[in-house]
């Protein structure tokens, strides 16, 4: 029986062609293969990967395998899988469980499958959003007697998660506890997952070391900002074919993702307004030339609404009922609770096409909801370009190597890769875009207190 679940394995040839192109745009990952391939630093690592199953992720998976790892993979979002990418990886012999448009029940079943190594126990997690880590740690707590944790689900997602935990406990008593003990470490890709890790550590519930990949400069200041700058408008266009020039767009949040999103919409000609709770980010938005407003003041007039905050209930039902006819509502934060989609379930829904729904309000006005409030750049398009993802995923590879080869040196907690590796990741991507670095003279380096080779900035420097 085939150890994979994909939409159509016949898509593998198409996926391989796109994967080959992506490799030419991902110099960091290819450099990792060249540098570390001979030494096989991940030999013995059994990595459970939960991250969007895209063409770019396929290059990451094959890099991890080239460095000696055994890998099983699922997507971290029900809409983000590129089916031809999943097929290419499955055809190459990697167990992958990912289908674009999978149900929430299937999502958690597939998350369970990435831990089911036929030989040996999973000992590493590569996570995006923290669901794989959550699954193991929550299950272990329930096995320890905290059954109240899964007694009262508050969402459809929790219903499916809790049912999957119960199913695994019946099939394999004690499995979660054994699995938790075997994990040497986790590397986390995104802001939301990092928040979860810090919260777990604060509560004394993180039993192994974790590397916060998101806050590597070459991730958050590039993937989050420049990636969103290209992929947000791509998703809106593919979903709606609407002309954005002249439209009023509201971006909720002005962190790195919000900055990239606002720039994306401005570049398309939209008149962009920003909402913020943080006075520093609000001041940045204003000085970048955006009008900073509260949502209630613009909700009736704007054409496009995008959430980027990582928080819950940012756009609520009362906001959507005030929106103009055919307003577009979407999210580019990791989870689907930034928009109160559950509150819309009793309204009239008309599916326009995959991941595009028209919802009628009691007033008769309609809104266009993208990807059911999940990541629209991956649900309605194909996510960030390969080049920027190369920087993010090179950090992931380095984090996995660090945890696997030096895990004994780390106590449970959340760590960041050293500045020297951050600069290395950036350096690996310069030649591809024709960048030439100036070299400090020894006297200049001494004058500013650094070495000629770097690192060039202190750990507290804010890029």
UniProtKB/Swiss-Prot annotation:
Cofactor note: Binds 1 NAD(+) per subunit.
Pfam families: AdoHcyase, AdoHcyase_NAD
RNA-binding among keywords: no
GO biological process, one term: S-adenosylmethionine cycle
Residues reported in the UniProt entry to bind substrate: 54, 128, 189, 219, 223
Classification via CDD domains: SAHH
Source species, domain of life: Bacteria
Location of this chain's protein in the cell: Cytoplasm
Enzyme class: hydrolase
CC terms in the record's Gene Ontology section: cytosol
Keyword NAD: yes
Main location: cytoplasm
Cofactor(s) recorded in Swiss-Prot or TrEMBL: NAD(+)
Pathway membership: Amino-acid biosynthesis; L-homocysteine biosynthesis; L-homocysteine from S-adenosyl-L-homocysteine: step 1/1
Catalytic activity: S-adenosyl-L-homocysteine + H2O = L-homocysteine + adenosine
GO molecular function: adenosylhomocysteinase activity
Keywords: Cytoplasm, Hydrolase, NAD, One-carbon metabolism
PROSITE patterns reported for this sequence: ADOHCYASE_1, ADOHCYASE_2
Family annotation (InterPro entries): Adenosylhomocyst_ase-like_sf, Adenosylhomocysteinase-like, Ado_hCys_hydrolase_NAD-bd, NAD(P)-bd_dom_sf, S-Ado-L-homoCys_hydrolase_CS
Sequence positions that bind NAD(+): 190-192, 224, 253-258, 276, 311, 332-334, 377
EC number: 3.13.2.1
UniProt function note: May play a key role in the regulation of the intracellular concentration of adenosylhomocysteine.
Subunit annotation: Homotetramer.
Family: Belongs to the adenosylhomocysteinase family.
Protein name, entry field: Adenosylhomocysteinase
Gene: ahcY
